[in-house]
């Protein structure tokens, strides 16, 4: 097929145009390549070592004075600037070439060794694989804590040390095997297992240490304290019971509070379904209204909202008052022992009667019941007599000892009545209890006149007192004759005692002398008023050592008061029994004569007139 001339001409023009475009594009590429491939040695700041081309400068092209600015090719000026110093450039080139050779030798030596990077890549991949089984951190959990066991053998340790010491003997396979066996058994971190425990440090349980310490403390308390030998067992049991009862109150209160708290939690769960209805979050429909009407009309159920707010507002601690704890403690104190005793008796009877025939079970049961009743009755009687000590039949109740420095009030004898004399002075009634009260009532005139020979021994008694205060004298205590009181056994065991003179005896003697002077003045005044005319008759008196004084109260059954005075003297540390006179009237300081009351250094007996 032949083409027309016009079509052939158009085709030629199109081919020419296409060739022209190809030539121009090739020219542009060559120019651009040459432009970008050219490196300015004076502008190394804009040199990019990665692409090995010059960066395009952002500086303005109008600055002609910048030395590092790459000059554009100017057709008008084709002169190439010469190097200012050729030798200096050559010198720098040699230095750079030398440094380049050194770096090349180092890199060659490094590349000659086996590369350990793949080993650590495999180790890290294994680590991530094991931890991914337990869970990896994500957006919800920023960090996770894992636990793993480290297994290290001798060969693995040697390979790791070779790598750390930069030795050439280590290999990639040995290192890979060593790292793969280090971390085994991955698991999540257990915080409780890592807490400090007393057992891990001291290898002993805390409970064992506390029990041993308590036993040692009890032993030390028993050895050191003296209460076990002084206080009676009944008093110790009573104190222990009081302490146990107080501890039981607190114990039961905490127990009741825990029970109330647990009940409160259970009620909260039960009334949770009424939350929306009682708080108004849910509107009541016709079914709820119908059920509410049925509850109020036909049932006796409480309002669920009332129960809901009671559970919500009332604190469980208010449900356990102290009175409730006291009541339950007393109830448990009475019922729990009986319950345990009944269980023990039941098990005992069951074990006793199970192998006996029926004919013997009834007699054995009766005997066991009688034995239990007798034991309970005897224990109750002993406890009652221990708590409340009733006076025995035929014995008089023991009177409490008088206070320190206080005289016991005189008592009339049972067979005598008070004397009647009107307003006139009458002699004090004579007590036959002991010699102390017998001599203590000598302030009365009648008694003084009856015992005039003894009142003449003033000087001799003063000598005896001075002798007693300057030396140690054995004191002998006499035991009353007749019916003895059980508590007087200690006086018979302490018949001979040695008394040391000291500050207490000297102070007592001074007080006695002062009181004697006052009593002597009163006695002299009364004696002058009632003095008899037959005063000049001879007086015969025995020396003090031979005075025979018989205890009056011993034969009259008043030994109880003597024992009481001895106890009182022993409790207050007084080793000397000094009997003082009782002042019956006011003292007169201007009387010249003085008389003294009797003070006995040795217990003597007085003849009964």
Curated annotation (Swiss-Prot):
Residues 1-25 form the signal peptide. Its main location: endoplasmic reticulum. Disulfide bonds: none annotated. InterPro entries: Chloride_chnl_CLIC-like. Residues 538-547 have a biased composition (Low complexity). Belongs to the chloride channel MCLC family. Pfam families: MCLC (PF05934). The gene is clcc1. GO terms for molecular function: chloride channel activity. The lineage of its organism: Eukaryota, Metazoa, Chordata, Craniata, Vertebrata. Seems to act as a chloride ion channel. Plays a role in retina development. It comes from the Eukaryota. It comes from Danio rerio. This is Chloride channel CLIC-like protein 1. It is found in: Endoplasmic reticulum membrane; Golgi apparatus membrane; Nucleus membrane.
């Amino acid at each position: 097929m032949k083409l027309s001339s016009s079509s052939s001409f158009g085709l030629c023009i199109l081919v020419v145009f296409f060739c022209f475009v190809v030539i121009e594009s090739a020219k542009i590429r060559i120019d651009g390549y040459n432009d970008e491939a050219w490196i300015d040695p004076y502008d190394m700041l804009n040199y990019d070592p990665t692409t090995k081309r010059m960066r395009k400068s952002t500086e303005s092209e109008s600055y002609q004075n910048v030395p590092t600015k790459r000059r554009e090719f100017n057709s008008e000026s084709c002169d190439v600037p010469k190097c200012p110093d050729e030798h200096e450039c050559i010198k720098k080139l040699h230095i750079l070439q030398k440094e380049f050779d050194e770096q090349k030798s180092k890199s060659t030596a490094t590349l000659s060794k086996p590369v350990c990077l793949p080993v650590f890549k495999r180790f890290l991949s294994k680590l991530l694989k094991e931890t991914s089984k337990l869970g990896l951190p994500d957006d919800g959990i920023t960090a996770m804590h894992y636990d793993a066991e480290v297994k290290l053998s001798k060969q693995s340790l040697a390979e790791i040390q070779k790598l750390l010491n930069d030795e050439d003997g280590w290999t990639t396979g040995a290192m890979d095997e060593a790292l793969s066996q280090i971390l085994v058994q991955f698991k999540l971190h257990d915080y409780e297992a890592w807490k400090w425990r007393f057992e891990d440090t001291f290898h002993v349980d805390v409970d064992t240490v506390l029990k041993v310490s308590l036993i040692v403390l009890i032993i030390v308390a028993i050895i050191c304290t003296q209460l076990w030998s002084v206080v009676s067992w009944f008093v110790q049991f009573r104190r222990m019971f009081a302490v146990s009862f107080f501890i039981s109150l607190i114990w039961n209160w905490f127990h009741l509070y825990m029970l109330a708290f647990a009940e409160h939690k259970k009620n909260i769960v039960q009334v949770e379904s009424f939350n929306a209805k009682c708080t108004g979050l849910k509107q009541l429909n016709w079914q709820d209204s119908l059920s509410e009407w049925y509850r109020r009309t036909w049932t006796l159920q409480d309002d669920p909202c009332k129960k809901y707010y009671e559970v919500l507002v009332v604190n469980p601690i208010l449900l356990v008052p102290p009175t409730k704890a006291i009541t339950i403690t007393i109830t448990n104190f009475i019922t729990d022992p009986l319950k345990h005793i009944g269980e023990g008796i039941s098990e005992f009877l069951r074990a006793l009667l199970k192998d006996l025939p029926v004919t013997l079970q009834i007699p054995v049961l009766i005997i066991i019941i009688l034995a239990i009743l007798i034991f309970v009755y005897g224990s109750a009687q002993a406890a009652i007599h221990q708590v409340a000590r009733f006076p025995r039949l035929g014995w008089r109740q023991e009177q409490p000892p008088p206070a320190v420095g206080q005289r016991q009030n005189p008592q009339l004898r049972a067979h005598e009545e008070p004397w009647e004399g009107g307003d006139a002075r009458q002699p004090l009634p004579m007590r036959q209890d002991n010699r102390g009260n017998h001599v203590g009532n000598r302030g009365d005139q009648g008694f003084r006149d009856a015992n005039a020979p003894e009142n003449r021994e003033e000087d001799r008694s003063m000598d005896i007192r001075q002798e007693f205060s300057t030396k140690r004298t054995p004191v002998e205590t006499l035991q009353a004759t007749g019916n003895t009181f059980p508590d007087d056994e200690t006086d018979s065991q302490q018949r001979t005692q040695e008394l040391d003179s000291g500050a207490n005896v000297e102070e007592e003697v001074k007080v006695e002398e002062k009181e004697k002077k006052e009593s002597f003045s009163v006695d002299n005044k009364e004696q002058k008023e009632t003095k008899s005319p037959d005063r000049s008759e001879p007086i015969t008196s025995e020396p003090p050592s031979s005075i025979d004084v018989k205890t009056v109260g011993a034969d009259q059954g008043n030994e109880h008061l003597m024992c009481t005075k001895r106890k009182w003297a022993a409790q207050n540390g007084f080793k000397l029994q000094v009997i003082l006179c009782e002042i019956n009237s006011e003292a007169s300081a201007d009387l010249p004569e003085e008389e003294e009351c009797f003070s006995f250094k040795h217990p003597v007996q007085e003849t009964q007139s």
